[in-house]
Amino acid sequence: MSSPENIHPTFGQLLGREAKEALLKQRGLVVWLYGLSGSGKSTLANALERRLHGEGVFTQLLDGDNIRTGLNSNLGFSDDDRQENIRRIAEVAKLFADAGVVTIASFICPRNELRAMARGIVGQADFLEVYVECSFETCERRDVKGLYAKAKAGEVKQFTGRDSAFEPPEPREAADLILNTDEQGEGESLEQLYRAVNPRVALPQA
């Protein structure tokens, strides 16, 4: 466990963010997508990354499944572990954004307090909160990963939306963008997402 006595920050000696953004010719940003399993957030995150990459934007995708097999492999799904999961992800996302990288995070992130914590860690100016809204019934019908069937059979515990609550943004204005994948297709959702992200990653003209 770290303590103030054995930590010696060297932030003043580090290469500044502006220099890194100038090299990449872009602004760092964290695009934080969240929603139920099966809502389409990972599909949109991947599609957004490919589109930005095709335009020469340097990106990094942080996805729930990948993070939990590496960085957060020691965490479960208790309330405390869910909070630590999001805290670590937000800290990593902040590091990427500070390096000028457009960081796309895709996680269930089920509670308002967790999203507020992530926004606080990253910083308001660098955080774009995107709620991928989709009804439980539609997500259960899609069941892309077979998790809803396993949860129904009791094979998956603490499953969000069934055993563990998912909180929509409250107030709804807490989310910077809401994409309703019940009502619109992937193409329309991606276009809305891209239009929200693109202006925020462009460097101001000198």
Which stretches of residues belong to each language-model region?
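Small-molecule kinase domains that catalyze NTP-dependent phosphoryl transfer to phosphate-bearing small molecules
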Residues: 133, 141-192, 200-206
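The conserved Walker
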Residues: 37
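Conserved lysine of the Walker
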Residues: 41
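Conserved beta-strand scaffold positions in the cores of enzyme catalytic domains, especially
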Residues: 61, 127-131, 176-178
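ATP-dependent NMP and nucleoside kinases share a basic, alpha-helical "lid"
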Residues: 70, 74-77, 93-152, 158
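Extreme N-terminal, non-catalytic leader segments
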Residues: 1-30
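Conserved substrate/cofactor phosphate-moiety recognition/catalytic segment
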Residues: 46-94, 98
